[in-house]
Amino acid sequence: MQNKIDHKNIKKIGLVTRPNVSLDKEILKLQSILSIYKVELVLFKESSEILDLPKYGLDDLFKISDFVISLGGDGTLISLCRKACEYDKAVLGIHAGHLGFLTDFKVDEAENFFQAFFQGEFRIEKPYLLSVFLEDKQGKILEKLAFNDVVISKNNQAPMAHIEVFRKEKKFNEYFGDGLIVATPAGSTAYNLSANGPIVYTLAQAFILTPVCSHSLTQRSIVLPKGFEIEIMAKDCILCIDGQENYKMNDFKSIKVGLSDKNVALIHPKNRDYFQILKEKLHWGN
């Protein structure tokens, strides 16, 4: 993953917006700002039906762009980050949605950001993703990435989930309840937090297992290091990646999860303070 961006030689910036919402006004404002720096704004083909701007499929957009803007909420950014890993491209999150824990600022603040950006005043953070290996009954392995979390939950027919977790073929825990969350540090402030899981610093090389509504008072979250791969077995359960992709666990004979070697470069304002964000979003202190 790239460690830096050559801000002096940016030619094209891609833009992907929150789906099913018209953000043409915001797009035009960003285009106007970027034109000052002689940078072309190019769109994902589904981001606008009206605007007469160059439009591309998602793969082509990543290929031609120096980096890509996510204009929406956290969900838009999360799905884009998984794609960015394929092309080794950075992502900038601009808020225009419901949830904004990961996005740093709104379009109204973009002029100040880009003024600083093109002077080299920005920072890049590279949180790690989860690798998920799904092996079907024929032995074919599908690898997926998760930015926030992988959630195993009971289906509608099961009274509760029975989930077994192994490491190197040795069982180290068994969960009875509504499900199990496997979260990245970046995802520790999402579903994991609402299930009383711990907050883990975004750039930590670790991941979290958090039971959901466990039927045992002794079951608690556990933080595991990079290099620790787990195998999860559960019947009549659904595996969900980042709240966006669902798989029936009965369709697979093996599911393994661990912290990936892949990370994604997120562009932030230089003065971004992770702990200040926690304080504001979670209403810590005064």
From Swiss-Prot:
Record-level GO BP terms: NAD metabolic process; NADP biosynthetic process
Record carries keyword Transmembrane helix: no
Pfam families: NAD_kinase (PF01513), NAD_kinase_C (PF20143)
The reaction(s) this protein catalyses: NAD(+) + ATP = ADP + NADP(+) + H(+)
One CC-aspect GO term: cytoplasm
Keywords per UniProt: ATP-binding, Cytoplasm, Kinase, NAD, NADP, Nucleotide-binding, Transferase
One of the record's GO molecular function terms: NAD+ kinase activity
Catalytic residues as annotated in Swiss-Prot or TrEMBL: D74 (proton acceptor)
HAMAP family: NAD_kinase (MF_00361)
The protein, known as: NAD kinase
Natural source organism: Campylobacter jejuni subsp. doylei (strain ATCC BAA-1458 / RM4099 / 269.97)
